[in-house]
Curated annotation (Swiss-Prot):
<feature type="region of interest" description="Linker">
    <location>
        <begin position="227"/>
        <end position="247"/>
    </location>
</feature>
<feature type="binding site">
    <location>
        <position position="363"/>
    </location>
    <ligand>
        <name>UDP-N-acetyl-alpha-D-glucosamine</name>
    </ligand>
</feature>
<feature type="binding site">
    <location>
        <position position="102"/>
    </location>
    <ligand>
        <name>Mg(2+)</name>
    </ligand>
</feature>
<keyword id="KW-0511">Multifunctional enzyme</keyword>
<dbReference type="GO" id="GO:0071555">
    <property type="term" value="P:cell wall organization"/>
</dbReference>
<keyword id="KW-0677">Repeat</keyword>
<dbReference type="InterPro" id="IPR029044">
    <property type="entry name" value="Nucleotide-diphossugar_trans"/>
</dbReference>
<comment type="function">
    <text>Catalyzes the last two sequential reactions in the de novo biosynthetic pathway for UDP-N-acetylglucosamine (UDP-GlcNAc). The C-terminal domain catalyzes the transfer of acetyl group from acetyl coenzyme A to glucosamine-1-phosphate (GlcN-1-P) to produce N-acetylglucosamine-1-phosphate (GlcNAc-1-P), which is converted into UDP-GlcNAc by the transfer of uridine 5-monophosphate (from uridine 5-triphosphate), a reaction catalyzed by the N-terminal domain.</text>
</comment>
<keyword id="KW-0133">Cell shape</keyword>
<dbReference type="GO" id="GO:0003977">
    <property type="term" value="F:UDP-N-acetylglucosamine diphosphorylase activity"/>
</dbReference>
<dbReference type="Pfam" id="PF12804">
    <property type="entry name" value="NTP_transf_3"/>
</dbReference>
<dbReference type="GO" id="GO:0019134">
    <property type="term" value="F:glucosamine-1-phosphate N-acetyltransferase activity"/>
</dbReference>
<feature type="binding site">
    <location>
        <position position="330"/>
    </location>
    <ligand>
        <name>UDP-N-acetyl-alpha-D-glucosamine</name>
    </ligand>
</feature>
<keyword id="KW-0573">Peptidoglycan synthesis</keyword>
<feature type="binding site">
    <location>
        <begin position="8"/>
        <end position="11"/>
    </location>
    <ligand>
        <name>UDP-N-acetyl-alpha-D-glucosamine</name>
    </ligand>
</feature>
<feature type="active site" description="Proton acceptor">
    <location>
        <position position="360"/>
    </location>
</feature>
<dbReference type="Pfam" id="PF00132">
    <property type="entry name" value="Hexapep"/>
</dbReference>
């Protein structure tokens, strides 16, 4: 569909009590404005003009300077003035869609309906009926068709009784929009150039104005403070949870589940309470996720169990694995099939072979670990000398005793055993027992120091 979009994002957001622009506050882990940009890109917008006024450098850094055409509104003189800053870029014959960076839940379906509804030479306007329309511009109709929009501060008492309100979202043809914007005046209670005044201008020219309702009213709710943002967050999460339930995912408590990215699921997934999904996560069949787990940009294969309060980021977990509780898998961690990683184990940039186990209180970093290896409690791969990192290689069928330190670079060959409490500084040969311990000392009749 041939259209361009204008996203208004110049407001200060003073009620957010924040140093960053309002539209950069996140919903589901993503800046509000990015939700709107993604919707436009998904529908194939030819150009996306983002009108900003405050924190331009910060906005460009977070939203991506190349994704949109940046339009500065140096003075905030109203919505009509804001759109007019981008008007020189509009093609005369293209559809121009006006959206808002602080209205993040607008759906692709609603936008498509609005674009399709635009009458030739006229305007398609998104409206909604509210039980309490206080503060919103009212839709004025005459025998059915929309003829004008009156803002709350300019409305008569009779007009204030109208419950159909303007959302601000609309579509018009570029050439018409430029002409109507150029003719706007600020003769109103707020001394601003209202975008809504183009409705009356279109009517005066005999152009049709078609009103369209959103798929869901929550889509057009804006954010002015943190309470409103929290409300939209809960609405968004409830919708995501409902979709997953309908796809067969068992959410033990849908109200305590957060999806802040994308989730691809197999069959018979079980997710307990307070689980957070971030980035791109893929789950195979029969995966069970315990309470309080956080998953980000990871893949979990079939029949794997993630026990409570495990954090997995940038990792790959194979089939039939057990992780947790209280495990941290960091970027580059790869657990092969039937691997076990237990409580208070941290793994980074490590391949843990099939059937291998590290069940207790262990740090594994920058290591290649073979099959059927047992890593005892308190084992540390010492991979960093303060400037550089080094690799530990452990072969198949190795047993590493508790409280051992492996000082990289070092190799422990197939079948070797490292005795508990050892500090391994040299390579260990196949099927060798390596023990490194200080000589014991015993002092009879020892008296502990006492306070004087």
């Amino acid at each position: 569909m041939n259209f361009s979009a204008v996203i208004l994002a110049a407001g200060k957001g003073t009620r957010m009590y924040s140093n960053k622009p309002k539209v950069l506050h996140t919903l589901a882990g993503k800046p509000m404005a990015k939700h709107v940009i993604d919707t436009c890109e998904g529908l194939g917008a030819q150009n996306i003009h983002l009108v900003y006024g405050h924190g331009g450098d910060q906005m460009k850094a977070e939203l991506g300077e190349e994704r949109v055409q940046w339009v500065l509104q140096a003075e905030q003189l109203g919505t009509g003035h804001a759109v007019n800053q981008a008007a020189p870029e509009f093609a005369d014959d293209e559809k121009v869609l006006v959206l808002y960076g602080d209205v993040p839940l607008i759906s692709a379906e609603t936008v498509e309906n609005l674009l399709d509804a635009q009458p030739t030479g006229g305007i398609a306007l998104l409206t909604v009926v509210l039980d309490n329309p206080m503060g919103y511009g009212r839709i004025i109709r005459r025998n059915g068709p929309v003829i004008a929009i009156v803002e709350q501060k300019d409305a008569t008492e009779e007009q204030k009784l109208i419950k159909e309100i303007n959302t601000g979202v609309m579509v018009a043809t570029g050439g018409d929009l430029k002409r109507w914007l150029a003719a706007l005046k600020n003769e109103n209670a707020q001394g601003e150039y209202y975008l809504t005044d183009i409705i009356a201008a279109a009517h005066d020219e005999g152009r049709a104005v078609e009103a369209v309702h959103p798929v869901s009213p929550i889509e057009v709710e804006g954010v002015n403070d943190r309470a409103q943002l929290a409300r939209l967050e809960r609405a968004y999460q409830a919708a995501q949870a409902q979709k997953l339930l309908e796809q067969g995912v068992m959410l033990r408590d849908p109200s305590r589940f957060d999806l802040r990215g994308t989730l691809q699921c197999g069959m018979d997934i079980e997710i307990d309470a307070n689980v957070i999904i971030e980035g791109n996560v893929t789950l195979g069949d029969n995966v069970v996720i315990g309470a309080g787990c956080v998953l980000k940009d990871c893949e979990i294969d079939d029949n794997t169990v993630l026990r409570p309060y495990s954090v997995i980021e940038g990792a790959t977990v194979g089939e039939e694995c057990t992780v947790g509780p209280f495990t941290r898998l960091r970027p580059g961690a790869e657990l092969c099939n039937d691997a076990h990683v237990g409580n208070f184990v941290e793994v980074k940039n490590v391949r843990l072979g099939e059937g291998s186990k590290a069940n207790h209180l262990t740090y594994l970093g920058d290591a290649e670990i073979g099959k059927r290896v047992n890593v005892g409690a308190g084992v540390i791969t010492c991979n960093y000398d303060g400037a550089n990192k080094f690799k530990t290689i452990i072969g198949d069928d190795v047993f590493v005793g508790s409280d051992s330190q492996l000082i990289a670079p070092v190799t422990v060959a197939n079948g070797a055993t490292v005795g508990a409490g050892s500090t391994v500084t040299k390579d260990v040969n196949e099927n060798e027992l390596y023990i490194s311990r200080a000589k014991e000392r015993r002092i009879a009749n020892w008296q502990r120091p006492t306070k004087k």
